Amino acid sequence: MGLHSELKLAVPWGHIALKVWGSQKNPPVLCLHGWLDNANSFDRLIPLLPQDFCYMAMDFGGHGLSSHYNPGLPYYQQNFVSEVRRVATAFKWNQFTLLGHSFGGCVGGTFACMFPEMVDKLILLDSTPFFLDSNEMENILTYRRRNIEHTLQVEASQKKSLRAVSPEEMLQGFLNNNSHLDKDCGELILQRGTTKVDAGLVLNRDRRISWPENSFDFVSKEMFVHSAKSLQASVLMIKALQGYYDVRRANDADKAPMHFMVDTLRSTLKERFQFVEVPGNHYIHMNKPQVVAGVVGPFLQGLQRMTSARL
């Protein structure tokens, strides 16, 4: 399944860009990338998955090849959840599978709770908890304020042209900010995340998008427990042992929120929940796609039933 096609889905602010592998007559699997990534992050994984599905990897608004939001409209997690619904409506999907990495898992998980009848399987690849870490309680208003101020600051400077840099400088800067990616994976994401101009490369992403905690729809633990009860999907959660455990990297050493999430899903979904730990870092699906495919493939086909495992 090495070949793919490109689609553009019209939306009120422009278009959502998608990469498609396989026949659209097959059961759909919608793939959601992580924060500031794009659909290319699934290029290494999808060719290794069962070929009797149609895989669509979308670029969230303001990412990759998708349109930026209209001026004045900030980026919040709820907006991305709405984009998933737009894609499902456009392709007339009554039910489909969601596969999300990192922040994409949070978006997919939120969608599966809001529209439980539409999601038959939910796959979370090193996704962070959907709820508010108690350590962040005093910071939540700061994040909201920071998002507004950042948006206003970017809008005030929009008349300035984007700074173009050489491909080498672009890659090095990207890798400096993404220590879990190697050179090849970094180049793969930048292929879709940059545009070539006379002076070099410029980033495609909307500069209004800042740190994920500024746009994350934090909910309480109580709300998360309540939302989990609405899930109708079978859920596979793959945790990279050297991956991320919190939306904010500063809290990564505290694994209690992740354990709470796993325990809640396990006690709520029972046999519909599978938890698998794999060796690797946050970009395990890019760095070691064969490891992830070995877990995701059987789950998609309903061939493997496990409640907990470590590979």
UniProtKB/Swiss-Prot annotation:
Induction, as annotated: Induced by passive stretch of skeletal muscle.
Tissue localization of expression: Ubiquitous. High protein expression in skeletal and cardiac muscle.
EC number: 3.1.-.-
Subcellular location: Cytoplasm, Perinuclear region; Peroxisome
Location of the AB hydrolase-1 domain: 27-227
Intrachain disulfide bonds: none
Keyword match Transmembrane: no
Cell cycle keyword on record: no
Entry keyword set: Cytoplasm, Hydrolase, Peroxisome, Phosphoprotein
Gene3D superfamilies xrefs: alpha/beta hydrolase (3.40.50.1820)
GO CC, one annotated term: perinuclear region of cytoplasm
Residues with the Phosphoserine modification: 210
InterPro entries for the chain: AB_hydrolase_1, AB_hydrolase_fold, AB_hydrolase_sf
Active site, UniProt feature: 102
GO molecular function, one term: hydrolase activity
The protein's role, per its UniProt record: Probable serine hydrolase. May be related to cell muscle hypertrophy.
Family: Belongs to the AB hydrolase superfamily.
Entry protein name: Serine hydrolase-like protein
Annotated source species: Mus musculus (Mouse)
